Amino acid sequence: MTILNHTLGFPRVGLRRELKKAQESYWAGNSTREELLTVGRELRARHWDQQKQAGIDLLPVGDFAWYDHVLTTSLLLGNVPPRHQNKDGSVDIDTLFRIGRGRAPTGEPAAAAEMTKWFNTNYHYMVPEFVKGQQFKLTWTQLLEEVDEALALSHNVKPVLLGPVTYLWLGKVKGEQFDRLSLLNDILPVYQQVLAELAKRGIEWVQIDEPALVLELPQAWLDAYKPAYDALQGQVKLLLTTYFEGVTPNLDTITALPVQGLHVDLVHGKDNVVELHKRLPSDWLLSAGLINGRNVWRADLTEKYAQIKDIVGKRDLWVASSCSLLHSPIDLSVETRLDAEVKSWFAFALQKCHELALLRDALNSGDTAALAEWSAPIQARRHSTRVHNPAVEKRLAAITAQDSQRANVYEVRAEAQRARFKLPAWPTTTIGSFPQTTEIRTLRLDFKKGNLDANNYRTGIAEHIKQAIVEQERLGLDVLVHGEAERNDMVEYFGEHLDGFVFTQNGWVQSYGSRCVKPPIVIGDISRPAPITVEWAKYAQSLTDKPVKGMLTGPVTILCWSFPREDVSRETIAKQIALALRDEVADLEAAGIGIIQIDEPALREGLPLRRSDWDAYLQWGVEAFRINAAVAKDDTQIHTHMCYCEFNDIMDSIAALDADVITIETSRSDMELLESFEEFDYPNEIGPGVYDIHSPNVPSVEWIEALLKKAAKRIPAERLWVNPDCGLKTRGWPETRAALANMVQAAQNLRRG
């Protein structure tokens, strides 16, 4: 029983973000479709070869996507919303781009499909749309073409296909409501056709991804798996693939399926591999996801070996990444600015392939010397002073319940804040950032590259802050912001100023489409060596008599949008960040800043996949926010901003944050989101977003007034604020001025009654 290895997928974008550049060039009309397709072919060939050279036995094919793999599956099945279809009914790459981004070099623009988080990762997928009576047919043969490409290059190919039940689970019904699971029998013939085509090509194994099997699914959905896979059996061997959590709760459903193998995530799941082995059919292959596909840390291969060795020789076994390596940067070797010690702690996608090769060889031979050598830096890290800060650990241990309580309840605080700020009814503000012009970005880049000295940089930033204050005063806003000209990214900026973080040069991972992010890496205990935002907030406040908000990114969001440590809990990291930012709140307050906003857009997306695990997460997530904010005096007003499409299921926790004001994204839902706050009888103040900042469209005064009147039917007017949905960083100044002018006018009209 020779053990093989494989990956579940590989990063698509290229080491230098070649795919992103090719996409954006094509969208802008600066290159041809054939040039774009050539870049895709070159990247696929390179990535297969890189994995092979690193020692991978079975190469994933079908993991590449021009925008998103769920969208690729929609096209495969012929699921193209009518508004995005070509007039002749054909499907091409521009069809795909119109669904993903609302426009393409050809065809008519139309509203893009909804985008949402892929399970609990920072990757986004395009939500499939389903209508009653929908027809499906094999339409987009990208998978088959890429399999042909890989076979022509003499690779050992394992196609990757998103499974039918998970595909339906991820979608939404449009128009007349019906049970989307009823479409299962309509999409299965397309899956059968695809598997038949793969069998014709001599494919032995197909990786069929069903990550929905790690969720607490309704019984009807669990029951759907057996008939679905009864219909798919027989043409090729199926590796039923799960990830991001364990499978034990749904194992009875899984073991009844006519598949030939199962992949389990042994990093993020709590499954015991020996117990799994006992419960799986004896002729099934087990693919053990031992190498973390969604973090950047070098694996302790001696530990991984010990985890799996007891079942070696007892069944067919593969070793694998826990999930697709899509969520990891590509290659650590090109990082030249990380010092040797820190660099030795990491493994990016290519290094993870090497780890799988080392693990496979050791399991086949019994010789673990190479594993011990690889794991040595991990042992050294456990005692590094760069990881452990006794002062931080001592402070964390000393936290009491009092540290997460404001001095008085909201009603007492609100009175003190009204006396201090004397704001009018319907107070107007913005969420924080103003347009990041080419001039601002160039200023920051020149300073970062050393082409601009600190004095000239500070003078430039000060000028942009001054301009933002002048613009806001001219518009008549009531509570101002400094505009965040000095910030490149709301998480990276804080990470750069906190001890315990490091940054990469090329650690890009795909977020969606052509958007890539470069998350900070938490390497050790987190502390704040000096004030971060105080200087610019204080300067902005000196320019006006109106209150200027201090702007902080909250602890849970910084955690969720970074690569976290694996040697301590997420709760520990969040509370360390909270303590560091608590000092920032105190310093802002001492500098005369009376309104402080702590953004937590990631609070909801950090929820565990299983609802039964939510309470524990929400408890420490809320506590981290409160530790951050509770140092504020009664007359300091704490704001928070959140952008979710769903509040109902976490309203208790949102109220428990005890922010004086919460601003939320509501314009696209026509204020429907306020239902949650109305039903809950939310006690504090709310700023429902009155226009969508993701659109360049300028809302009319009448439209904003109508939205606010609608809001006032749900929430008492004396507790309502007036603000956009989100920050204005990506907008231009002309539409920003026009939209804010109309927003202020609408508020003034309402004050006059």
From Swiss-Prot:
UniProt record, GO biological process: methionine biosynthetic process; methylation
Pfam families: Meth_synt_1, Meth_synt_2
GO molecular function, one term: 5-methyltetrahydropteroyltriglutamate-homocysteine S-methyltransferase activity
Key word Methyltransferase present: yes
Class of the enzyme per the UniProt entry, highest EC level: transferase
Residues forming the catalytic site: H694
Catalytic activity: 5-methyltetrahydropteroyltri-L-glutamate + L-homocysteine = tetrahydropteroyltri-L-glutamate + L-methionine
Cofactor(s) named in the record: Zn(2+)
Alphabetical list of SUPFAM superfamilies matching this protein: UROD/MetE-like
Binding site for Zn(2+): H641, C643, E665, C726
Family of this protein: Belongs to the vitamin-B12 independent methionine synthase family.
Protein name: 5-methyltetrahydropteroyltriglutamate--homocysteine methyltransferase
Biological source species: Shigella flexneri
Organism phylogeny: Bacteria, Pseudomonadati, Pseudomonadota, Gammaproteobacteria, Enterobacterales
Gene it is expressed from: metE
